[in-house]
Swiss-Prot record:
InterPro entries: Anti-muellerian_hrmn_rcpt_II, Kinase-like_dom_sf, Prot_kinase_dom, Snake_toxin-like_sf, TGFB_receptor. Pfam families: Pkinase. It comes from Homo sapiens (Human). This is Anti-Muellerian hormone type-2 receptor. Disulfide bonds join C55-C79, C92-C109. It comes from the Eukaryota. Keywords: ATP-binding, Disease variant, Disulfide bond, Glycoprotein, Kinase, Magnesium, Manganese, Membrane, Metal-binding, Nucleotide-binding, Pseudohermaphroditism, Receptor, Serine/threonine-protein kinase, Signal, Transferase, Transmembrane, Transmembrane helix. Residues 203-518 form the Protein kinase domain. One of its GO terms (molecular function) is anti-Mullerian hormone receptor activity. It catalyses: L-threonyl-[receptor-protein] + ATP = O-phospho-L-threonyl-[receptor-protein] + ADP + H(+); L-seryl-[receptor-protein] + ATP = O-phospho-L-seryl-[receptor-protein] + ADP + H(+). It is found in: Membrane. On ligand binding, forms a receptor complex consisting of two type II and two type I transmembrane serine/threonine kinases. Type II receptors phosphorylate and activate type I receptors which autophosphorylate, then bind and activate SMAD transcriptional regulators. Receptor for anti-Muellerian hormone.
Amino acid sequence: MLGSLGLWALLPTAVEAPPNRRTCVFFEAPGVRGSTKTLGELLDTGTELPRAIRCLYSRCCFGIWNLTQDRAQVEMQGCRDSDEPGCESLHCDPSPRAHPSPGSTLFTCSCGTDFCNANYSHLPPPGSPGTPGSQGPQAAPGESIWMALVLLGLFLLLLLLLGSIILALLQRKNYRVRGEPVPEPRPDSGRDWSVELQELPELCFSQVIREGGHAVVWAGQLQGKLVAIKAFPPRSVAQFQAERALYELPGLQHDHIVRFITASRGGPGRLLSGPLLVLELHPKGSLCHYLTQYTSDWGSSLRMALSLAQGLAFLHEERWQNGQYKPGIAHRDLSSQNVLIREDGSCAIGDLGLALVLPGLTQPPAWTPTQPQGPAAIMEAGTQRYMAPELLDKTLDLQDWGMALRRADIYSLALLLWEILSRCPDLRPDSSPPPFQLAYEAELGNTPTSDELWALAVQERRRPYIPSTWRCFATDPDGLRELLEDCWDADPEARLTAECVQQRLAALAHPQESHPFPESCPRGCPPLCPEDCTSIPAPTILPCRPQRSACHFSVQQGPCSRNPQPACTLSPV
């Protein structure tokens, strides 16, 4: 049985953690990717290893050991990016985790006392994953006093919290006895939406077309035109203001980004009143719904793929136009539910609820975008199925997080391109593609867990299956396969940019043209194809009564069978 590593003896005795900051042992073995150095402040303790680090974003330490042939080696030690389950432990109790190398097992621990990640007393046998580790080191007499003080402090804190709750209930009761309205909690915001936003009497609600965690999307009409209304409850005003701020950025107008019309307040009833985003409505619904219901020939599939890449390239681009600065933006929640189909069959990217403004190189001096608070906010992402491997295993490059988030979007884009091409009959010898499946649905089913996705996409490095018949149709036999593989590469730095993706797709759309390849794009990227000028037929204008009354059209639910909140199709009655 392994004994203690004895790392405590290597720590300088002069390091003392301030009472409000956690101090941990810091060490990273040579060759380890994804440094956690930015999660804390390295203390100047000389050149000896390991060093000490003072945590910036949590009060939790971690340690990772590699057990090979009954011999343990330290892989990483440092601060966690947030307080996670297990951080309440006073000692380092390692638990096993699979290792990609045969004959090796990783052991990890989280703990919440100073330098607690420096040592462990016992590692569980590698052949019994899930076996809890043995108890940590016995507490010294001084530690017993410290633990008693901690328990006393927690008791006093609980008592104070209980008193605050009782006081709030008494105040609420007094308001009711005196007949005064109970004051509602006001969200912490620089702008009071209830005062700033005006109601639109001509806005009417028809039918719910999608429900999310922070908002409900309605089909409706504004001044005789069909619109989508994203209604937020008052408790989600922070999400409303974040998404509104992005839509109101100068220069964000693009054919393949859902068009923002206005912000308002109201609802289908007085009791449901809250902040609203009024957006362009696309009656054909989401990409998921469309692919479930229809197949698309080679030209239509390339049209959807190219327009999707153009929209993402525009979001990612930092540019000046007509004296206005548009920053680069990472979407962070690309999925076939958040991409809509326009009347001309092209795509429009929607749902900027998790989108993030990226640091730029040419931004004006007065430009002060809201920066994310800590690594946890940077690595926040949307639909798990479309999350890049570096987000699943939390190894995103925090040194250059702007570029890292762009690369994570490219991975999601590759999965959407695969979904589009999987419904193209021209890529099948019998012209009969199989029923639509989401990315990884064939491998993991409808509701994969994060652990299942991590094992498949990170540990095994598997990707959705590309049929060999795709090579038989395209003018460039390996073009489709190379495009997808260059977008969902396990190495984020090896992935294409969104601009290069649209140039590759343009070459597939117009193979007869001569395309010079710029040197800046890996494996060559042809220039952009000309903009498509296909006109969009105007939607039918239907009569509408004032706000909170039903509109004279109905929404036919067109289920995307893989999602409980499907996209919908509008149809006049």
